[in-house]
């Protein structure tokens, strides 16, 4: 199964695995699953580190590509079709990072691994 991590799941999986739900940890650990991470998560982490809103994640931001590679995650680029889809989503949720991750999940027909129920308004499948 392919699963797209939201940004909080990326952070918790790499910095604080016990913050993940048992199901989330099992999903990530299952080698039969392909774990996807959007470029939107890199953008969000870098932005929040720069603004001082993500204390303790500076090393993750600096070593992001190496950390993702070591974890075995597949990185998703942001393409024009996903950007258009994110902008066209009618849900009221305004977070641009969440909108992009939801658009990518919908385009790929994959579930999002996230604790955030706000993502449900996009009509995505969510695992937690």
Task: Describe the residue ranges of each PLM region.
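Residue-level signal for well-ordered alpha-helical positions
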Residues: 16-17, 48, 89, 125
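Alpha-helix capping/helix-boundary segments
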Residues: 9, 41-42, 82, 101, ...
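Short, well-structured N-terminal submotif of metal-dependent ribonuclease cores
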Residues: 1-38, 51-66, 70, 108, ...
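Short, conserved active-site loops that position catalytic residues or coordinate cofactors/metal ions
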Residues: 39-47
């Amino acid at each position: 199964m392919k699963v797209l991590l939201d940004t909080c799941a990326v952070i918790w999986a790499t910095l604080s695995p016990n913050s993940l739900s048992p199901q989330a940890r099992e999903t990530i650990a299952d080698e039969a699953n392909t774990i996807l991470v959007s470029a939107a998560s890199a953008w969000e982490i870098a932005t929040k580190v720069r603004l001082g809103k993500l204390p303790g994640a500076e090393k993750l931001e600096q070593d992001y590509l190496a950390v993702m590679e070591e974890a075995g995650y597949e990185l998703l680029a942001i393409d024009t079709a996903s950007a258009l889809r994110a902008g066209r989503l009618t849900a009221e949720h305004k977070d641009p990072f969440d909108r992009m991750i939801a658009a990518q999940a919908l385009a790929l027909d994959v579930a999002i691994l996230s604790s955030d129920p706000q993502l449900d308004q996009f009509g995505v499948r969510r695992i937690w």
